[in-house]
Amino acid sequence: MRLRNIPGAEAALREYPTFVDNPLFYKGNWKERFGNNNPIHVEIGCGKGRFINTLAERHPDINFIAVELKAEVVLRAVQRTEYKAIPNLAFVQYDASKLTELFADHEISRIYLNFSDPWPKTRHAKRRLTYKSFLNTYRQVLVADGELHMKTDNENLFEFSLNQFAAERFQMRNITFDLHQSKLAADNVMTEYEERFSSRGQRIYRVEASCVIK
């Protein structure tokens, strides 16, 4: 579903304390933004913001950053914060293909990919967030034992991703082809999209992958 254009969205974002207007300033120094040395977890694509907000509330000892390209999407997500300054949560409007401009080498402990665009046409494979070029970027910004957690409702994207992880020497675990019927469901935080589609009987696929520093 296409999100309608919201006039003035970029200006409106600056009214929210969780939005970071100058993210490049913090590259290598996100600890200054959060005021601590806690691990950093990044969600690429934030949807309506439920997932990242819930994690921030449950884990005050972890810093969370949502990276999203479209201002309208970020605005909808930050509105969940109701203008509150949540100390361990930040939203950034930026292109995820340029993560190395936002983060220094090995600055992130975990990356979340939730229901990313599957780009089903073969000629668009390079745009998939689990394509090898993206995985190499993740490896660069993740710590040595950093993790990538992926969820999708698209079986073809999931199988493609598993193959990419294997080819790029990511170590996989907790692979499930039906998340909500697995033991992993108990600790699962659902996105709005996930809740809607799983309620219709759609299976959710999930995997955790750890990078090996080359």
Swiss-Prot record:
Keyword presence, S-adenosyl-L-methionine: yes
Annotated pathway: tRNA modification; N(7)-methylguanine-tRNA biosynthesis
Protein keywords: Methyltransferase, S-adenosyl-L-methionine, Transferase, tRNA processing
Highest rank taxon of the organism: Bacteria
Catalytic activity: guanosine(46) in tRNA + S-adenosyl-L-methionine = N(7)-methylguanosine(46) in tRNA + S-adenosyl-L-homocysteine
Molecular function, one GO term: tRNA (guanine(46)-N7)-methyltransferase activity
Gene3D superfamilies: Vaccinia Virus protein VP39 (3.40.50.150)
Region forming the signal peptide: none
Cellular component, GO, one term: tRNA methyltransferase complex
Family from the record: Belongs to the class I-like SAM-binding methyltransferase superfamily. TrmB family.
Function comment: Catalyzes the formation of N(7)-methylguanine at position 46 (m7G46) in tRNA.
UniProt-recorded name of the protein: tRNA (guanine-N(7)-)-methyltransferase
Species: Brevibacillus brevis (strain 47 / JCM 6285 / NBRC 100599)
